[in-house]
A protein has these predicted regions:
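Conformationally flexible catalytic loops at phosphate/diphosphate-handling active centers
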Residues: 1-33
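Active-site diphosphate/adenylate-binding microenvironment
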Residues: 186-234
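Short acidic (Asp/Glu) and glycine-rich catalytic loops that position anionic groups and cofactors
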Residues: 10, 139-143, 191-195
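Generic structural signal for well-ordered, non-membrane alpha-helical segments
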Residues: 19-23, 27, 46, 50-57, ...
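Glycine-rich, acidic loop regions that bind phosphate or pyrophosphate groups
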Residues: 1, 70-185
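Proline-centered turn/helix-capping motifs that create local helix->coil transitions or kinks
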Residues: 1-6, 175, 225-228
Length: 234
């Protein structure tokens, strides 16, 4: 078969990723739980990045005022410099949060399966007491490791859009996180950033990986359009 015939034989997919709309009662259950939170947290995962629903996810974060923690594959979805980013306070927010909304993030080994000391549990198998909202396209992910109190199954874009609709319907009645919670996160972020700054400022010989990170940080600051490539081989 020549190239022209091969190209002509290809079948065009009309709708490669049809929307999967979440059940309205599941969305309402998630919103009801989120409203009760005293120390809410949003965790953004790889699925959130793949969904290409950046604008809606940002709107959800900013409308609710809930701090967010990006997983490594969700970096860049929202900036780490955003005032609601808890990226520099990960070890503080995970065990302290009382309601955690997972958006395209799964409770696998990267999140210690939702339990253990990472989440404030007494030992590596103990549940920390958090309540989870999980937005995911796969129903099999709900309750795979710990209880998911409010699973919302559907594509990320449709689920986040539905959540936004429910929040907007409440208008000014949506409760924002307390100043104490946000202030505690900011204090921990500032402390960790200052501590890392001291480490990066050292210039040992031979150089270590912190030295390289310091140089790269300076390059990015002066060249914000620079593209960094991380080669992931072990």
């Amino acid at each position: 078969m020549d190239a022209a015939a091969g190209k002509a034989s290809l079948i065009k997919v009309v709708d490669p990723a049809p929307r999967q709309i979440p059940a309205p009662d599941a969305v309402q259950r998630a919103l009801n739980l989120l409203k009760t939170a005293k120390r809410p947290l949003i965790v953004l995962g790889k699925g959130a990045a793949y969904a290409q629903a950046d604008a809606d996810i940002r709107a959800l974060v900013e409308k609710t005022g809930i701090p967010y923690l990006p997983m490594s594959m969700a970096k860049g979805l929202l900036p780490d410099t955003h005032e609601l980013s808890a990226a520099a306070a990960r070890s503080y927010v995970l065990p302290e949060a009382d309601v955690v909304m997972l958006i395209g993030a799964r409770l696998n080994w990267l999140l210690s399966h939702g339990k253990g000391k990472t989440w404030g549990g007494k030992d590596h198998k103990a549940w920390g007491g958090q309540k989870f909202i999980q937005i995911d396209i796969s129903p099999q992910e709900a309750d795979s490791n710990v209880r998911i109190d409010a699973p919302v199954v559907g594509d990320i874009g449709s689920c986040v859009s539905a959540m936004l609709g429910g929040i907007s319907a409440m208008g000014a009645g949506w409760p924002k996180p307390s100043a104490d919670w946000l202030g505690a996160i900011t204090e921990r972020k500032d402390r960790n950033v200052a501590k890392m700054g001291e480490t990066l400022a050292r210039n040992p010989s031979p150089m270590n990986f912190h030295s390289a990170l310091n140089v790269m940080r300076d390059i990015v600051k002066t060249n914000p359009d620079a593209i960094l490539v991380n080669e992931g081989a072990n």
